Amino acid sequence: MGGGNPVVAQMWKLVEPVCSAEGMELVFVEFNKESQGRVLRLYLASGVPDRGVTLEDCAGISRQVNGLLDVYLPELDNYTLEVSSAGLERPLAKEIDFERFAGSRVKIRTAAPVSDRKNFTGILLGVSDGNVRLMVDDKTFVIPYGEITRAKLVNEDGVSQ
């Protein structure tokens, strides 16, 4: 998953060690062209159970990442960097996320149809052998991890996942 964007791949390599050193988990990286220009978004989660991501955490990571980008990716100019909490409906970006959040309600979108559909909302059963298992209306779907273009937790009735 990740679409093969080389900037996103470089960002993971540069930013993940910074986040880990600060007790944060890098959850997801986006690099998009939007109406206001190019936007680089980093989504974080706390590496400490029952602790959220604070504004100070985001600001600290932002300062460090800006410095890294200036040194290692100087060709990346004229962009906006946004650093925020992944939130209750956090993206699932790594294969291990699909195991960690087994039992949670999720939304998944695929690149190609799986059983004649591309969008799924159901209970995540886990991942094995490169396949994500999902229960939707009492039916189990097996979705190849490599076909997933977007996945996130679904927050139901204000209850965090």
From Swiss-Prot:
Coiled-coil regions listed: none
CDD domains xref list: YlxS_C
Domain of life: Bacteria
GO CC annotation, single: cytosol
Signal peptide: none
GO terms (BP aspect): ribosomal small subunit assembly; translation
Record's keyword annotation contains Cytoplasm: yes
Compartment(s) of residence: Cytoplasm
Protein keywords: Cytoplasm, Ribosome biogenesis
InterPro entries xrefs: Ribosome_maturation_RimP, RimP_C, RimP_C_sf, RimP_N, RimP_N_sf
Major site of localization recorded for this protein: cytoplasm
UniProt similarity note: Belongs to the RimP family.
Role: Required for maturation of 30S ribosomal subunits.
The protein's name: Ribosome maturation factor RimP
Organism: Desulfosudis oleivorans (strain DSM 6200 / JCM 39069 / Hxd3)
